[in-house]
């Protein structure tokens, strides 16, 4: 076992059922944490052993531990005490809470039963759970009351609290494609550039792509291309901050022409460069390797 392991930040997410633990674990995943949902406390020592033996390649971990684990109260405090004696792990407990009326309302909306009152009234289970979790809540380093928080607001609060300056929380993925091969199924925004002048009709450019300077210069020189770039970058400059504020971890922007060789490739490269200073950007060309004698 390595003795020179890197330090591990661990967040244990717990709290009242229905208070937002699912949103919380998704938020930590967006922050680059290695996440495990419903880890039984008895498995925590073995889990940490595996992390350490791996050389701590996962140095940020978020775990959901709650009443779904049958041995929750028997083993959790023992595991927490053991963690306190571990020099290479810094554990923090994030406790999510909400008032009774909010929790009852959420259970009614989802039509789910409370885990401690599967055949009874939700409030009975809530009251019992609140009593059982009282000591654990007292040991929490951070408590968030989600009674008046929308999922997006809870996500924002977690990101603001746990994000580091080097954490990548939002990325812009730009992909070129050919309409003849179908739309990218993961696209959030699709722009059709088939109205732009087509290098396919210039014989010596036909075998080239938008990655070639001659082709990109040809596509970009037209007034309609410049107008398109002006309008699209202005639109995206407005939209992207709002996507980020809503808690999205990435936005996929698809630029399409007929075959995905010339115009879409040129514009995808341009838009990727345009936003590279402000966001983490990735540019890919889905259909650039598909070469058939067709309009590009």
From Swiss-Prot:
Ligand binding (ATP): 15-22
Pfam families: PapZ_C, RapZ-like_N
Molecular functions per Gene Ontology: ATP binding; GTP binding
Record key words, sorted: ATP-binding, GTP-binding, Nucleotide-binding
Domain of life of the source: Bacteria
Coiled coil: none
InterPro entries assigned: P-loop_NTPase, RapZ-like, RapZ-like_N, RapZ_C
Sequence positions that bind GTP: 66-69
Family: Belongs to the RapZ-like family.
Physiological role: Displays ATPase and GTPase activities.
Name this protein carries in UniProt: Nucleotide-binding protein Aflv_2526
Organism lineage string: Bacteria, Bacillati, Bacillota, Bacilli, Bacillales
